[in-house]
Amino acid sequence: MRRAVLEILEERIIHNVKEIHRFSGKRIIAVVKANAYGIGVREVSRILEGLEEVDAFAVACTQEGVELRECGIKKKILILGGILEEDVKLLEEYDLTPVISDPEHLKVLKDRNIKFHVKYDTGMGRLGFTNEIIKDPRVEGVMSHFSSPADRNFSKLQIKRFEEILKNYEKVKYIHLESSAGLIYRVPFTTHVRVGLAIYGEKPLKDYPLEVKPALRLRARLISVKELPENYPVSYGRTYITKRKTKLGVVAFGYADGLMKTLSNRSFLIFEGRKVPIIGNITMDMTMVDLSGTEARTGDWVYIVNEERSFTPLARDAGTIPYEIMCNLSRRVERLVIKKR
């Protein structure tokens, strides 16, 4: 039985990539780390590989880069999350491009003929050099990262700092700063944009100017539908007591599949376009919903995410960010690419 399916809408992925390219005027470094934000790196990267707007991919570690190569990706692959001595052999064998953000990373490369990008910390307080200029013919690109793109004043300060640093680098092929949210700044001196979330149609900011479309549908099966009497408890801890006779649906999707427990008693799923409230505590493998007034039957599909409600508002209900919910989608969820017609 298919318990849960994440549908990846190829046509919308392609639309979103073209919209990002149209808006920015730049080619894209597609961020597909963490299994493409939980969506499915093999499925997503194979769509993106064939798009001329996508110039390169970015992942967190060498192991993720190796996985991309093994599923047939030929384009450039950046390793964003640092390297150690043990990574060098894989960098060479799989033609991976490291991002250098610490003096020790440079020592690891020694005299190896491996091109790399240099990362600068312009206000993120995480990875990156601050003022050090790397004079090395192997430098192929320079990058930085916004810490809070919604804060326009601080983001403009980061842009200014990055521009000053770039005065020390001439003729580098790749200069990248803008993320999905950072696209709004249209930084004039970058060559590429480094984007993940917007590819899937999630809007990282209110009043987002790009016309991206939700490209994901997450659905799960009803494995039981039954009537409960008034004043009857639902799920662990009896945090919900029925207020009337209730048609209870048990959905084969729980926190082990990626639905955060914080959504218990405070959000909804979608059945045939109708919002059905989550009632009681979400459990490891199941979620209970109130199906009263519907014709739902065991075996029907209920949507967690679709064109009506993307991961972003779902995350808002959970008190988190869409990245966290997406990255928590487990391997029990089947990934299915819906091909462009």
Curated annotation (Swiss-Prot):
It is an enzyme of class 5 (isomerase). The modification N6-(pyridoxal phosphate)lysine is found at K33. GO terms for molecular function: alanine racemase activity; pyridoxal phosphate binding. GO terms for cellular component: cytosol. Signal peptide: none annotated. Belongs to the alanine racemase family. The keyword Lipid metabolism does not apply. Keywords: Isomerase, Pyridoxal phosphate. The active site is at K33, Y236. Its cofactor is pyridoxal 5'-phosphate. GO terms for biological process: D-alanine biosynthetic process. The keyword Protein biosynthesis does not apply. This is Alanine racemase. The gene is alr. SMART domains: Ala_racemase_C. Its EC number is 5.1.1.1. It comes from Aquifex pyrophilus. Substrate binds at R126, M284. InterPro entries: Ala_racemase, Ala_racemase/Decarboxylase_C, Ala_racemase_C, Ala_racemase_N, Ala_racemase_pyridoxalP-BS, PLP-binding_barrel. Pathway: Amino-acid biosynthesis; D-alanine biosynthesis; D-alanine from L-alanine: step 1/1. Strong thermostability. Catalyzes the interconversion of L-alanine and D-alanine. It catalyses: L-alanine = D-alanine.
